Amino acid sequence: YDLIPILEDFIEEHPDFSYKGARAIIAFTGYEGILGYRTAASYSDSPNYEQDREQAAKVAQCLKDNGWELASHSWGHLWMGVSSVPGETFKISDERFYTDTDKWEAEVESLIGPTDIYIYPNGNDVADWRPYTEDNYRFKYLHSKGFRYFCNVDASKPAWIQKGSDHLRM
């Protein structure tokens, strides 16, 4: 959580560092809430639950107003994609995939606003290296939720980019 003031202080001292006021991308999970606030539905019995949700939404808006991009990192930081085990297709069931995506929409997007950036947890993409196709129902579901930029975090593999007609994968 110290990243934000550190980068803001640096940009204040070095304004040429930030192209057109851009900052960084902050990717959110939701299973423990966001931005230090207990916003997950599992905390709904807390006397501060609604206040925490309101405050988190204000902080998220402030970040966006100041050039920060906000992204999804899934709700539960699950292995969303392809399994490396022979004979297995995906790491988690379809039901868990859909539930996780819907929880993120309900518990995180409802506070930070829509985003078109999805950063795969654990670098676990919903497909192998081949371009996404219409047959990939997990990609189609994420796409239907408004995601257009699909990012991997697996630094153990060489960097690559695929440009689809309406999405970018990297």
Where are these regions (language model features)?
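Active-site beta->alpha N-cap acidic-glycine motif
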Residues: Y1-C62, N66, V126
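Glutamate identity and glutamate-enriched acidic tracts
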Residues: E8, E12-E13, E32, E50, ...
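Loop/turn elements at helix/coil->beta-strand transitions in domains of secreted/extracellular proteins
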Residues: H14-I25, K64-A71, S110-I117, K145-F150
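A mature extracytoplasmic/lumenal domain signature
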Residues: G30, S74-G76, N122
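Surface-exposed cleft-lining segments at the edges of enzyme active sites
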Residues: L35-Y49, H77-S93
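Polysaccharide-binding and catalytic clefts of secreted carbohydrate-active enzymes
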Residues: V59, A71, L78-V82
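C-terminal active-site subregion of NodB/CE4 polysaccharide deacetylases
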Residues: G81-M170
